[in-house]
Amino acid sequence: MKKLLHLFFPLSLRVRFLLATAAVVLVLSLAYGMVALIGYSVSFDKTTFRLLRGESNLFYTLAKWENNKLHVELPENIDKQSPTMTLIYDENGQLLWAQRDVPWLMKMIQPDWLKSNGFHEIEADVNDTSLLLSGDHSIQQQLQEVREDDDDAEMTHSVAVNVYPATSRMPKLTIVVVDTIPVELKSSYMVWSWFIYVLSANLLLVIPLLWVAAWWSLRPIEALAKEVRELEEHNRELLNPATTRELTSLVRNLNRLLKSERERYDKYRTTLTDLTHSLKTPLAVLQSTLRSLRSEKMSVSDAEPVMLEQISRISQQIGYYLHRASMHGGTLLSRELHPVAPLLDNLTSALNKVYQRKGVNISLDISPEISFVGEQNDFVEVMGNVLDNACKYCLEFVEISARQTDEHLYIVVEDDGPGIPLSKREVIFDRGQRVDTLRPGQGVGLAVAREITKQYEGKIVAGESMLGGARMEVIFGRQHSTPKDE
């Protein structure tokens, strides 16, 4: 049973729409139908009463009062509007004249009815109605069909009572006219039977139209569901913003969420790539130190501080990149002041160990007064990548110089290597792009360096060195030690 319920519940929007609208249409159809039928019934009763009153007036015209007796002479070719049975009473309720002798009908006439004009109904069984119909064969045949279907069926006859005041030629009379054809056998009564068929046909016609209306109305939601499935299957990046007014806000917020999640994912992936790249230098120093220990070129006491320093740097780098990954775009940069010379000394010392076999000669021309304002790890990451590239591609010499203004810090790194072709001087800053594909590397370092300098409103400019190789000018902006007043 639970499985069966799960197939139908919760109901889809289309089924809900169809059930709700079908219920509304059904209720309205029933309400309108009942109002129409009640109105028709009232109109039918009024029409019947007018017809029977016309018959009553006809008999009153034909009636004559002679010798204290009532005489009614009916012409042979009289044209009556409908088959009727007429009874005439005096003011005391005594029967003066009857069109035919029908005892059961005379008993059904209530004395109270004879006191005023009115419209009434009497109930009779099929056999009594048959006596009242006399020679109407078509109606008798219909009545026989009713008798065959239900022998206990009851028929309803309309009765019109009209009171005529006394005149010089006629005493006060009450004429009762009974419609001999029961209401159930009149063609106008069939409207009650037709109502069920009309209501059924109405629903059969309306439900397909409601289905079309539901399909058309819910198309934007179906389109949105399809786009969400495409997102799940990675066939789409964003939802289509061109949708209905009611869904615009939802789609816009979902697209913002998707963009935010994609940017966060890209940021984590980029940060992880940058972290692995930043660990290359300290790991290379550790590897070089271990190699020196193995070949006994360095004692344990000499190697220990070097290894501890690189392990500390690895720990700092991991913490630094975890912090970067959790930073939001509007996070303020650190305003710490760091002397540049000691930072570059540590970097060159580590790189000398990495490129010990190559015999790189790194020279520094840095004034002790020059300082960097910002996050120390940002400076180390930028200059570490730039210096690593210089040491990797130089023949022997790498020169570092620096100068500072109120707003900017300029650090120039030059080498005597093959240099960078003019057409490649912008490409090298794109992630994954490398000029020399023969040497190991991922093409990440300079891209990371430029991204960090942009956070300081700075840049890195590649050019040609006086030594014959590459010249990299690193520019850090926002170097005022205290924020300026706005």
From Swiss-Prot:
Residues 215-266 form the HAMP domain. It comes from the Bacteria. The record marks N202 as: Plays a critical role in the switching between kinase and phosphatase states. It is found in: Cell inner membrane. ATP binds at residues 385-393, 415-420, 434-446. Residues 274-480 form the Histidine kinase domain. This is Sensor protein PhoQ. GO terms for molecular function: ATP binding; metal ion binding; phosphoprotein phosphatase activity; phosphorelay sensor kinase activity. The modification Phosphohistidine is found at H277. It comes from Escherichia coli O157:H7. Signal peptide: none annotated. Residues 1-16, 216-486 are cytoplasmic. CDD domains: HATPase_PhoQ-like. It is a multi-pass membrane protein. Mg(2+) binds at N385, Q442. GO terms for cellular component: plasma membrane. Keywords: ATP-binding, Cell inner membrane, Cell membrane, Hydrolase, Kinase, Magnesium, Membrane, Metal-binding, Nucleotide-binding, Phosphoprotein, Protein phosphatase, Transferase, Transmembrane, Transmembrane helix, Two-component regulatory system. SUPFAM superfamilies: ATPase domain of HSP90 chaperone/DNA topoisomerase II/histidine kinase (SSF55874), Homodimeric domain of signal transducing histidine kinase (SSF47384). The chain crosses the membrane at residues 17-37, 195-215. The keyword Magnesium applies. A divalent metal cation binds at D151, D152. Its EC number is 2.7.13.3, 3.1.3.-. Member of the two-component regulatory system PhoP/PhoQ involved in virulence, adaptation to low Mg(2+) environments and the control of acid resistance genes. In low periplasmic Mg(2+), PhoQ functions as a membrane-associated protein kinase that undergoes autophosphorylation and subsequently transfers the phosphate to PhoP, resulting in the expression of PhoP-activated genes (PAG) and repression of PhoP-repressed genes (PRG). Pfam families: HATPase_c, PhoQ_Sensor. Its main location: membrane. InterPro entries: HAMP_dom, HATPase_C_sf, His_kinase_dom, HisK_dim/P_sf, PhoQ_Sensor, PhoQ_Sensor_sf, Sig_transdc_His_kin-like_C, TCS_sensor_his_kinase.
